[in-house]
């Protein structure tokens, strides 16, 4: 076997079953193939048998739903996932292989078995070790679990491959993000996870396989699904949250890259393999696509373009993997460049394991080496926080790394950076910032007990003596529970310490969880509020109806969920309290929109849509926007939009990023197509106080 070459950051692994898009053939926006693809016919006999078994399963589920037993309520999703998978396959022709009929039968039989077990109080699938037919104890390796998603209330599956020891505690877990599989819907995913242990985790390790809401590289709703699956697994298995690695290959490699840079303090290691790490270069290299993005699309690329965030890997051990002749080696090459092209005193080499003469697969020898290195990283891992933090973000959506949290930026979609040093021999944290206007530092009671102050200065690349703390020094005593923290806010050019007893501000500002863009509303619990009557203009009504139905349909097809839908008359106070509201219609057709219309920065009258000093005819234009809900400023309100990427973007995961900023005016005289909801007459981001910016 030829000797492996090593470049620099860690990632890994498994064969991706179908995986990537079709290249230049998928660059024609006017001729877009469907995703998921059309299914194949199963026989009438197979369908009849599946429908009979599904009916039986649903009857037991209906009885279980009426139970007041807390265990039944908690573990019912472990049963419902089997019913939903086959129900969707039957209703939507989600069979792509003649063997899928048998897979559906197996899935239903397991669902029926679990339903009866839950009914009798025997949740056998929870046991890590079971008795086989001979009465011997054997490991229950492959288990499919389910949880109810906060996004839309649907049950979502994930797989567990469990190689932990009997009665083990504080177990290491690896999240494995899967490769692209346009035919990998719920049925196929569950059937595979019931029996397939590839990639096999290392001995003693639990591997978590998120469904990821289908085929989106674990972005947007898929990102939330991954974190929800992890949260559920930690509750159900003896996993140490500080011993979790993020991994994947192909599309899953892309997922691992962005989850690594966005959440650098969640993992003890990252192991991305192949895939992509940004949008524009990958689409040029892999897709041969001639990109002509709008200025706001380029801004929004920064949400998932990982090279901008490369600095964050300084605190996260990373092992990248590629085959030498795999075109997707480009992903790690780009990240290696980004890591090395940081300022001289911050740059580092990315560890990149390259398998010689290997295409799009994981070389067995490389896999062994990766596992060895991950085991070492796990072994030397400590619960101590890093003394040095280097953190960059472009949005308050991702605003923390370990003991540093950014609360406000000068401007979104420009890199905001914090470089902080907490020398245990010193009494002060030294902080340098760029494009940051408010931040906090927090240590637990057992972390760096000598720290008493924070010094903050502007960030300068290659600063010679960046530890200097001669000015802007802020002191704080340990809190009564011996934790330590300080919150600092910049007022003009002057930093000031925020009093811990300062009343919470009610000002409408961009903050973590309320920073946009439009797509962010669908990364939290949301509800559609449909029109109650006709609106002011027939053409607008027609467009609203079309886009509403499309948004409901595509959430189901692409994000594998079911939208909560109510009319304004059905809306309850708890809905306003708990959900981001996606309002459809205009102020005449939607009473909820009518209540808040005059409180939005964009006005919508019978004659015009008014954006500052710009006016657009209300007969032929409609606004889409996101804004803190005037009825509950802790939640969003969105007008007339679901997630903003469309059918053309389904064909390559690198395209699946937000397409519209905080607001846009849609010219309805141009019909919607596979890329846009109509012609975008104007669009922009709101400012940091959710105000309109001057026209460009």
Feature names for model-found ranges:
Residues 168-237, 527:
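Active-site machinery of serine-nucleophile hydrolases
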């Amino acid at each position: 076997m030829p000797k492996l070459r090593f470049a620099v950051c860690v990632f890994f692994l498994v064969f991706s079953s179908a995986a990537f898009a079709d290249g230049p053939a998928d660059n024609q926006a006017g001729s877009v193939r469907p995703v998921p693809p059309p299914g194949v016919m199963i026989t009438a006999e197979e369908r009849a048998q599946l429908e009979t078994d599904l009916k039986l399963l649903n009857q037991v589920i209906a009885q279980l739903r009426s139970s007041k037993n807390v265990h039944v309520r908690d573990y019912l999703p472990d049963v419902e996932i089997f019913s939903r998978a086959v129900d969707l396959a039957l209703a939507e022709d989600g069979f792509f292989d003649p063997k899928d009929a048998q897979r559906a039968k197996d899935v239903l039989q397991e669902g029926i078995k679990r339903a009866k077990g839950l009914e009798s109080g025997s949740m056998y699938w929870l046991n890590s070790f079971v008795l086989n037919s001979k009465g011997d104890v054997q490991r229950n390796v492959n288990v499919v679990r389910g949880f109810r998603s906060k996004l839309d209330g649907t049950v979502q599956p994930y797989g567990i491959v469990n190689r932990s020891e009997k009665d083990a505690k504080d177990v290491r877990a690896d999240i494995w993000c899967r490769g692209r599989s346009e035919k990998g819907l719920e049925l196929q995913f569950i059937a595979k996870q019931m029996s397939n242990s590839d990639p096999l985790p290392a001995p003693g390790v639990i591997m978590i396989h998120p469904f990821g809401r289908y085929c989106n590289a674990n972005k947007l709703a898929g990102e939330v699904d991954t974190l929800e699956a992890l949260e559920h697994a930690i509750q159900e298995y003896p996993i140490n949250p500080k011993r979790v690695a993020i991994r994947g290959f192909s599309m899953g490699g892309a997922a691992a890259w962005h989850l690594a840079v966005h959440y650098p303090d969640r993992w003890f290691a990252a192991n991305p393999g192949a895939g992509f790490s940004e949008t524009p270069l990958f689409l040029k290299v892999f897709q041969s696509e001639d990109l002509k993005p709008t200025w706001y699309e380029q801004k929004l690329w920064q949400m998932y373009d990982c090279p901008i965030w490369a600095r964050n890997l300084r605190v996260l051990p990373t092992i990248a993997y590629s085959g030498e002749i795999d075109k997707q080696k480009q992903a790690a090459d780009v990240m290696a460049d980004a890591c090395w092209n940081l300022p001289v005193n911050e740059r580092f080499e990315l560890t990149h394991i390259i398998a010689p003469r290997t295409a799009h697969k994981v070389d067995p020898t490389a896999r062994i080496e990766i596992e060895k290195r991950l085991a070492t990283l796990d072994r030397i891992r400590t619960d101590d926080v890093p003394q040095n933090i280097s953190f960059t973000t472009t949005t308050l959506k991702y605003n923390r790394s370990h003991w540093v949290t950014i609360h406000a930026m000068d401007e979104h979609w420009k890199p905001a950076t914090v470089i902080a040093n907490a020398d245990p021999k010193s009494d002060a944290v030294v902080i340098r910032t760029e494009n940051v206007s408010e931040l906090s530092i927090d240590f637990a009671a057992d972390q760096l007990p000598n720290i008493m102050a924070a010094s903050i200065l502007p960030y300068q690349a290659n600063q010679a003596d960046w530890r200097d703390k001669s000015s802007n020094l802020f002191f704080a005593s340990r809190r009564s529970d011996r934790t330590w923290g300080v919150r600092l806010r910049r007022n003009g050019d002057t930093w000031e310490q925020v009093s811990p007893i300062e009343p919470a501000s009610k000002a409408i500002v961009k903050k973590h969880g309320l920073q946009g863009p439009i797509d962010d509303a669908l990364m939290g619990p949301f509800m559609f509020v449909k029109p109650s009557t006709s609106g002011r203009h027939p053409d607008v009504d027609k467009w609203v109806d079309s886009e509403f139905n499309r948004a409901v349909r595509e959430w189901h097809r692409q994000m594998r969920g079911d939208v909560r839908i109510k009319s304004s008359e059905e809306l309850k106070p708890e809905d306003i309290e708990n959900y981001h509201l996606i309002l459809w219609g205009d102020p005449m057709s939607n009473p909820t929109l009518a209540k808040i219309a005059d409180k939005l920065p964009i006005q919508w009258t019978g004659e015009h849509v008014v954006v500052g000093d710009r006016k657009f005819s209300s007969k032929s234009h409609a606004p889409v926007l996101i804004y803190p809900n005037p009825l509950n400023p802790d939640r969003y309100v969105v007008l007339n939009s679901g997630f903003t990427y469309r059918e053309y973007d389904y064909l390559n995961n690198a395209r699946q990023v937000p397409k519209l900023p905080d607001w846009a005016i849609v010219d309805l005289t141009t019909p919607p197509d596979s890329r846009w909801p109509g012609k975008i007459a104007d669009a922009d981001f709101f400012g940091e106080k959710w105000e309109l910016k001057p026209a460009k």
